[in-house]
Amino acid sequence: MKTIMALDEENYKELLALWELSVTATHDFLSKEDIQVYRELIGETYLQSLTLFGMRVNGKIVGFIGLKDQLIQMLFVHPNYMRMGLGKALVDFAIKEYNVTEVDVNEQNTQALKFYNNLGFEAFDRFEKDDAGKLYPILSLALINKS
């Protein structure tokens, strides 16, 4: 199993590049312009407000998770490493070590919804707009069944 390590500001550039690769592969509902807007927000604000952990392969970060209290704020895996258990390992780590119980997911991101449902999370709330005020509905999910 890959080792999960804490990440900090020295990793932000690499995390932003990984975020963009992952979002481009999984968030087909976002325009290129929106991706650029979110990239700036994440780089300037979001990363600094989160507790970050990641996994490396051959020295490169291939997956990371961002936590705030007991909420998963972001989870991204390099497209070449998706469906290999990295995301599950990061979520399991967050649940075990940080007692994570919730996650927010774009409603249009059906892959992520299925992923979290399979890990025991279920929707309990819905917001019409995301944190940036854009019309990308957000579903709040709570951990119902610890697997």
Regions picked out by a protein language model, each given a short descriptive name:
Residues 51-63:
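Conserved beta-hairpin
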Residues 104-106, 122-139:
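Conserved catalytic-core motifs of GNAT/GCN5-like acyltransferases
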